[in-house]
Each structure stands twice: as C-alpha cells, then as structure tokens.
Curated annotation (Swiss-Prot):
The lineage of its organism: Bacteria, Pseudomonadati, Pseudomonadota, Gammaproteobacteria, Legionellales. GO terms for biological process: maturation of SSU-rRNA. GO terms for molecular function: ribosomal small subunit binding. This is Ribosome-binding factor A. Monomer. Binds 30S ribosomal subunits, but not 50S ribosomal subunits or 70S ribosomes. Its main location: cytoplasm. The keyword Cytoplasm applies. It is found in: Cytoplasm.
Length: 123
C-alpha cells in the first residue's frame, strides 16, 4: 500500500475544511467578534481526539479558546452531520502561536538590519 497520506492526515484535512465553514455559521456567541482561522488539525491515531489549532484577529485568545472549547461538543455534532465517519473525534481547541512567533522574529530581524535609507539619499 503506497499511499502518500495516512488516513489520519486525510481526516484532519477534512475536519479543517469543514470546521472552517461551520464555525462562522454556527457559533453565535456575541463575545466572538474576531475572525477565527483554523490553521491546523492533528488527529490521534485512534481517531478519538483531534487538536484544532486556530488563530484569531483582534480578539483575546484566551476568551476565544474558552468559547470554542465550550462549544466543542456542539461543533462535534455539527461536524458529524457533515462528514461520514463512524465516530467523530473529540475536539480540543488550541491557540496557534506560530504566527505571532513569526511576526516577532520578523520584527527582531528588522531591528537588527534596518532598511538602509542612507544609500537612497546618496544616489
């Protein structure tokens, strides 16, 4: 069997696509004003649990994490209606800090190597 992707990877990708559609449509919490983006999904080998990594713009990440984890059982049932799996994994939402980390590194690089404006003045 020479599949390029494992079954868990295919399921994770499907869950990511479906949740990206379900969350904006189904979550009506007034505290959730920002735009939630699902950045990655990691599914356990036994398909019992799924870690959902997300980012959010202009919102408190701990509040959004609590909202999403509070709605996890509802999102799981909405997900079960839209996909065909024997069992839908339990969802655990985790804030993805990789984007903030990348922005922080970019700022540090810009501080160390500022744009050379003096060469523009000499030309």
């Amino acid at each position: 069997m020479s599949n390029n992707f494992k079954r868990t990877d295919r399921i994770a990708e499907m869950i990511q696509r479906k949740l990206a559609l379900i969350i904006p449509q189904e979550i009506k919490d007034p505290r959730l004003k920002g735009f939630v983006t699902i950045s990655a999904v990691k599914v356990a080998a036994d398909l019992g649990h799924a870690k959902i990594y997300f980012t959010v713009l202009n919102e408190d990440k701990s509040v959004v994490t609590n909202i999403l984890n509070g709605a996890a059982s509802y999102l799981r049932s909405a997900l079960a209606r839209s996909i065909t799996l024997r069992t839908v994994p339990q969802l655990h939402f985790i804030y993805d800090e990789s984007i903030e980390y990348g922005q922080r590194l970019s700022r540090l690089i810009d501080e160390v190597n500022p744009p050379d404006s003096s060469s523009d003045d000499n030309n």
